[in-house]
Amino acid sequence: PRAYSIAGERGLSYVFTTDDTDTDTHPNTVDIRMTCLNGRTFSVRGESLGGGKVRISRIDHIDVDFSGEYSTLIIIHHDRLGVLAHITRCLSEGYVNIAFMKLFRETKGDRAYSIIEFDGSLPDHMVSRIYENPDVQDVMFIPVKGENENGF
């Protein structure tokens, strides 16, 4: 209920528009297009499933599938040998217990998305540790409410 005032307090600007042309989507779907301070833009599609449950179904133009019920890492990287091993090694060294993990890619050798849902919190240094691999382009951390709030 306070979303608008919180957004204003944090300096976020927003615009709502409707799209009546896309008739193949779930009726409770929202597409969010974001521009970061560094100018990078990306979009996220989410669906309200009812009962307080949501599903994220797209990031940029890649179909994904995760619930937001767990703390989540979204890692955008090049589809190259060893990147996934680097990510899981970092998480293992930080004692992060993976609940669900999915990898999506645009095309072989191009951009890939690793979606990692896990139990508990994320050590403070973990995002910077994952960035140490030169093929990692972006790391976003979405904490579950009540966990550490180091968000992206």
What kind of region is each of these model predictions?
Residues 1-152:
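A conserved regulatory-domain signal marking ACT and ACT-like small-molecule sensing domains
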